[in-house]
Amino acid sequence: MSDRSLSELGEQGLLPLLQAFCPAEQRGDDAAILTPPAGQQLVVSSDVLVEGIHFSEATTPPAAIGWRAAAANLSDLAAMGATPAGITLALALPSDRRLSWLQQIYQGLDRCLKQYDCPLIGGDLSRSPTATLAVTALGWVNPNRVIRRSTAQVGDWIMATGTHGLSRLGLGHLLGEWTLAEPLRDQAIAAHQAPKPRLDVVPLLARSQPAGTVWRVAGMDSSDGLADAVLQICRASQVGAVIEALPLPATTSFDRDRLIQAALYGGEDFELVLCLSPDWAQALLELLGEQAQVIGQITEKPVVQLRLSDRTEILSLDRGFQHFTTH
């Protein structure tokens, strides 16, 4: 089929092409049917990606838009301790957008979903002057093993998986804000365009739980930055924190101050930030190895303080990205 515009194909011409990405048993009806595993509860997460706000041609090829749309929502499931059950994708697009662009969106989405064993189970199409993707992810969770933001306690260790700041470095390189050298450049661009939701950590939490203890894991993902994650957990749990280490990219070729700001406030790293009792945290570290580190501790005073060898500062939500603000 030639690379026609969406207006030339029309909705009825598009639907069979897009339904091919869904399992056969989920095609053709008005809604999807899911059967919950015994003893599991449903977890639902929604996300919207708007062209010019969340992605642009300069930084994100269509396949990467699809991958990121899936990854962001799968990361929310991981942050709740859930496993994926399915995803829906609704799109509103300009009528002159090309079919190849839309197909690449679905191909990127499909690659991500297959990697994490999650089916595409539905969606919708509409016309709009601005390209917009609305994703809903559904997952299953054992109600006795939910991760909450509100359960951190004084004395908990704060753990962060992976590296923070890479996505922001990649975005800055693509926007021309700075030039990264190899191998950091490829690592940073990959982190921005193809983030990896940490669903692998969810089963390890159960495996590392100390015998005879009650399930209590506080956490969330770091989609809006490491500082935001710690601050949101502390706000919900009515506690504070001291951060004494940061999981920065391993490089000596980039300014340290920028690395720190990227890790704290850059966002879109889609790692997990978890608060656990010290013995539980230590057991999880032994399973994750270099994929995680302890970055601080929960304190009673409701302030989040960064305390590194070369700086001390109070962290604030005002420094990170927020919709409807001008900074």
UniProtKB/Swiss-Prot annotation:
Disulfide bonds: none annotated. Mg(2+) 2 binds at residues 47, 76. The keyword Magnesium applies. Mg(2+) 1 binds at residues 46-47, 124. It catalyses: thiamine phosphate + ATP = thiamine diphosphate + ADP. Transmembrane segments: none annotated. Gene3D superfamilies: PurM-like C-terminal domain (3.90.650.10), PurM-like, N-terminal domain (3.30.1330.10). Mg(2+) 5 binds at residue 224. Belongs to the thiamine-monophosphate kinase family. PANTHER family: THIAMINE-MONOPHOSPHATE KINASE. Catalyzes the ATP-dependent phosphorylation of thiamine-monophosphate (TMP) to form thiamine-pyrophosphate (TPP), the active form of vitamin B1. This is Thiamine-monophosphate kinase.
